[in-house]
Swiss-Prot record:
It is found in: Secreted, Cell wall. Residues 1-18 form the signal peptide. The gene is AWP1. The lineage of its organism: Eukaryota, Fungi, Dikarya, Ascomycota, Saccharomycotina. One of its GO terms (molecular function) is cell adhesion mediator activity. May play a role in cell adhesion. The keyword Electron transport does not apply. One of its GO terms (cellular component) is fungal-type cell wall. Its main location: secreted. This is Adhesin AWP1.
Amino acid sequence: MSLITIFAFFIKATLVLSLDILTPTTLTGDQTFNEDVSVVSSLTLNDGSQYLFNNLLQIAPSSASVTANALAAVSVFTFSLPPSSSLSNSGTLIISNSNTGPSTEQHIVITPNVMANTGTITLSLAHTNTDSSSTLIIDPVTFYNTGTINYESIGSETNDPSLTGNILSIGSSGRTLQNLGTINLNAANSYYLLGTITENSGSINVQKGFLYVNALDFIGNTINLSTTTALAFISPVSQVVRVRGVFFGNIIASVGSSGTFSYNTQTGILTVTTNGVYSYDIGCGYNPALMSGQQETLSFQGNLYDTFLVLVNQPIPSDLTCAAVSSSITPSSSVEPSSSVEPSSSVEPSSSVEPSSSVEPSSSVEPSSSVEPSSSVEPSSSVEPSSSVEPSSSVEPSSSVEPSSSVEPSSSVEPSSSVEPSSSVEPSSSVEPSSSVEPSSSVEPSSSVEPSSPAVPSSSAEPSSSVVPPITPIPSSSVVSASVFDTSSTLPSSPTVPTSSVSPSSPTVPTSSVSPSSPTVPTSSESPSTLSTPSSSAAPSSFCPTCVSSGTPPAPSSSAVVPTSSAGGGNGGDNGQPGADGQPGAAGQPGAAGQPGAAGQPGAAGQPGAAGQPGAAGQPGAAGQPGAAGQPGAAGQPGAAGQPGAGSGGGSEQPTPGAGAGSGSADGNQSGTSSGTGNGQAGSGQAGSGQVGSGQAGAGQAGSGQAGAGQAGSGQAGAGQAGLDNTASGQSEGGQASAMDGDQSGRGGQSNSGSLLQPNAQQGTGSGTGSDTGADQASGESPGQIGDAQPGSGTDQSSGRHSLAAEARTSQSHSLAADARTRSTTRQTSVIAPGTAPGTAVVTTFHGCGTVNHKGMINILLALALLVLL
């Protein structure tokens, strides 16, 4: 359907009552539109399971949009534009469904009568389980796309073991897809492109998965592959399919069996031959050695096909552009005689035939060898030296030049074609006017004469090139080209030397011989190595780059035509002098026939081309720079020196004097006894607390724990007073404890005289003993300081024992291993708690020790108190 038909349809559709969306509008739930919908602003459809547009959906201008969002968690979602509808989109159409699950289905069916998209259509869909339960189709009757069609994925479905889910099918058999825009495929494992694809600027980008193409024609569009994507053609098309992005991991599949492939590095065409022939333009620059092919089985629409795969195992070349191939001679470039053949004798201008191109010894046809600038024969088209006329063809003596043997119109010059002159030289002495050179022989496309380079006849030779030469016979009839030869443009330099001489009365000017400037048009197309088999003589068999149009014979050549026939009285060869006319004999006898001229010398062999200069040697790569040496790590800092520990010795404790406990009794002559016992207090030796220095061994000094000196208590004897009928209590002296044994016997107390009431009382005697045993033990441990890297050791042990007999000594040592701890026993004065009855044992708690019982001391105090009272 033409664009006029499309526009007419939409104009007609606008006459129908329509729903116009002029402001942003949101509709919720399922929607069915039986009227035309024209969206000028935006239309959003939310939370529906189906959206149906049964008539025209028009989205314009480019800022307008329609967004259809599927209801969350819905199992079946449908968006439909049926055949009764039409779609005209200049803005944006988005269809979105993110639901997944084993039972999830989606039916996106866009099959309107006409779909004209100049904007953007996006299918944003999650992956559903199979295409048998879901339907994704874009297949309008008329498909016209100059915009963008996106198919993208927004979710993943794992319940698809056969990888057949979400297959989007675009087009159908018998319909045409006019795609001037872009189609992006990036959501599924497979896509189908069906029908006939046309237009010259469209592109189909396969960004994920496998694109299957089943088309009758594929015109103008480019298929762009991406990483690990593939392309399959189910049947061959007559066009060359343009494919880009072919590299590692890509596959190009062509249905058919017994497949083979070839790659033309000059044209970039990959040709696959199976039951049919597939041609893919993948670009130049690939290495055929890095391509591989294999036969596989392909599944398409439920059917299995034998398929040939081509894998490209190389990156994309940096430049895919192919060099201009000018060596093809197109069929339209017909070669017409344009160079006049001018014999040395008078040849009428009408019989001049101009060659349109010359053949180089290197078998290349160069544009410079043409007489007229218009006949530009490309230099790359070559007729190889092997396609030369075999030297066995010779001019028969009896043959006359008959131009009637025309160059066949069917003869074409291919790079492989050989020159086959069909004209035979016959002995008639005239060039028959009926002979014509037909210029209709076209040069085939394989020899690089471009269509624009037909040789235009520069003489009076008609298109039928009928040569009617009223040529005056000239003995030295050499064919001389009027065109100036360029020595660089090598021409067939060995014109056929006519060996058949004609009598002076009717010499034949060999105008039908192939001159250096008039190449014979070949009648067959052969490979470059095929030798031409001339049907007659007058064909050059060698090429001479040094020959010019002077009519002089060429230098000897190994490939020159060697004359094999001769005739008497004829013209000599190029170098031979014509024989003298016979003298009339007597009685009118003809003179002797002239001797034939010496045979022309073969042309000089072509000089070999200069040897190619060797390529410049590759420069060595710059030497790698050594890596920078690693910097040594910073030296560790030594630890700060530790301070020596200050060890202090245990302190000394002076024991308190022991209180003497004495008792006295007086009974007449009875003697009193007194004894006292003093408990010395233990000195508390404090251990020095040595601090551990960091890294320095301290000299730990032992603390000197002094033992407290235990003083013996002085036990006073109670003074016994004599009373009536009572013996006075003698008071004992306070005996001092001996410094040696700590035990002293008190001197007997002096009794007082008897009282008046007891005049007869006798003097009492008293004795007192006092003992004091001091016990003091202190222990302490202290760690010495680490100093001067010498480990110090020290322990602190203070012990002391005091007695009247000896003085305690203190020892102390320090240890580095542990802090010294000091245990001290401190003896404090007993304090009797208020209200304590005499004789009661008082328990006093001391710091750092247990409890001490002082019952004996109480007894002594009671005795002293009694004496005071008395």
